[in-house]
Swiss-Prot record:
Chain residue ranges for the region called Essential for glycoprotein binding: 115-151
Motif (PPXY motif): 35-38
Keywords: Host cytoplasm, Host membrane, Host-virus interaction, Membrane, Phosphoprotein, Viral budding, Viral budding via the host ESCRT complexes, Viral envelope protein, Viral matrix protein, Viral release from host cell, Virion
Compartment(s) where it occurs, according to its Swiss-Prot or TrEMBL record: Virion membrane; Host endomembrane system; Host cytoplasm
Subunit comment: Homomultimer. Interacts with nucleoprotein and with the cytoplasmic domain of glycoprotein. Interacts with host ATP6V1A; this interaction plays an important role in virion uncoating after viral entry.
Function: Plays a major role in assembly, budding and uncoating of virion after membrane fusion. Completely covers the ribonucleoprotein coil and keep it in condensed bullet-shaped form. Inhibits viral transcription and stimulates replication. Plays a major role in early induction of TRAIL-mediated apoptosis in infected neurons. Inhibits the integrated stress response (ISR) in the infected cell by blocking the formation of stress granules.
GO biological process: viral budding via host ESCRT complex
Similarity comment text for this entry: Belongs to the lyssavirus matrix protein family.
Primary localization class, coarse: virion
Name the record gives this protein: Matrix protein
One protein family per Pfam: Rhabdo_M2
Length: 202
């Protein structure tokens, strides 16, 4: 197991030294470091900056030659550099992408469409999250192309404040979602007031 971790670490170090995010993705897609342990975010009642948001998320994957999550993960590793929206929404967009892509796709022409409709609870640090009553929306298209492959991602996320009781925003499993979150470097920390909760810092 230690040998595997060293191999993965060395591979990750090599990836970070690559000058261009459009370089070819690694062939060993099964090698990845699991992200920090994600645990359910419990119900909070006394938090002034805790708000429930109804989330609509849609991710379209377009590729004439099919696609693999190896390619998607390669694209999303550089998400911080290519994100074009409101920075207060970047953490939420990352989570929605991960959750949406881990669900069941629906064919739509040449596209595969993943949709997420779920009530999520977030806590932002330093008042960086949405303002009271604010609605956030983000749409973006990301493409990856070389001589052999073309993959396009169309992302649309809408967050509206609502008063429905939410459940969790993260899943403590070694799932495809966690792989995507790990690739996108989602910033979290354990709550000082509740050891069973992870807080979103962005």
């Amino acid at each position: 197991m230690n040998i595997l971790r060293k191999i993965v670490k060395n591979r990750k170090d090599e990836d970070t030294q690559k000058p261009s995010p459009a370089s070819a993705p690694p062939d060993d897609d099964d090698l990845w470091l699991p992200p920090p342990e994600y645990v359910p975010l419990k119900e909070f009642t006394s938090k002034k900056n805790m708000r429930n948001f109804c989330i609509n998320g849609e991710v379209k994957v377009c590729s004439p030659n099919g696609y693999s999550f190896r390619i998607l993960r390669h694209i999303l590793r550089s998400f911080d550099e290519i994100y074009s929206g409101n920075h207060r929404m970047i953490g939420l967009v990352k989570v929605v992408i991960g959750l949406a892509l881990s669900g069941a796709p629906v064919p739509e022409g040449m596209n595969w469409v993943y949709k997420l409709r779920r009530t999520l609870i977030f806590q932002w640090a330093d008042s960086r999250g949405p303002l009271e009553g604010e609605e956030l929306e983000h749409s973006q298209e990301i493409t990856w192309d070389d001589d052999t492959e073309f993959v396009g991602l169309q992302i649309r996320v809408i967050a509206r404040q609502c008063h429905i009781q939410g459940r969790i925003w993260c899943i403590n499993t070694n799932s495809r979602t966690c792989q995507l979150w790990s690739d996108m470097s989602l910033k979290t920390q354990m709550s000082e007031e509740d050891k069973d909760s992870s807080l979103l810092l962005e």
